[in-house]
Amino acid sequence: MRHRKSGRQLNRNSSHRKAMFKNMANSLFLHETIRTTLSKAKELRRVVEPLITKAKIDSVANRRNIFSKLRDDAIVAKLFTELAPFYKDRPGGYIRILKAGFRAGDKALMAIVQLVDFETTTDIVAETTDFS
């Protein structure tokens, strides 16, 4: 039985899921916006938001903890020097999930994941939003 099991399986084993969300989080921190399926976007929120919250307190322990999850020095440095100070006064809700139509191949519901209030362009949303 699957009672009290949180999170989505997404038809992947646990190591694949962990690697996928690590790569998606790295891409989000690098580009400030990514396009993915809606269910992956909702699950990505559970990975990204605690990382930004932890990065608000700059300590060696927090840097090592986040590095153990992201495994990229440049992304960790950007997270602590640019993103965390930007969200210092925000208590949570660092990412925005916008529905972006359906994928052409399998009609999967797509979403745009953006960092809130950060200098991102919303042109991607205008181009890809088509619910017809």
UniProtKB/Swiss-Prot annotation:
Pfam families found in the cross-reference section: Ribosomal_L17
InterPro entries in the record: Ribosomal_bL17, Ribosomal_bL17_CS, Ribosomal_bL17_sf
Keyword field: Ribonucleoprotein, Ribosomal protein
GO BP field: translation
GO MF, any single term: structural constituent of ribosome
Record-level GO cellular component terms: cytosolic large ribosomal subunit
Subunit structure: Part of the 50S ribosomal subunit. Contacts protein L32.
Assigned protein family: Belongs to the bacterial ribosomal protein bL17 family.
Alphabetical list of HAMAP family matching this protein: Ribosomal_bL17 (MF_01368)
NCBIfam families per record: L17 (TIGR00059)
Annotated protein name in UniProt: Large ribosomal subunit protein bL17
Organism of this sequence: Ruthia magnifica subsp. Calyptogena magnifica
Organism lineage: Bacteria, Pseudomonadati, Pseudomonadota, Gammaproteobacteria, Candidatus Pseudothioglobaceae
Gene from which the chain derives: rplQ
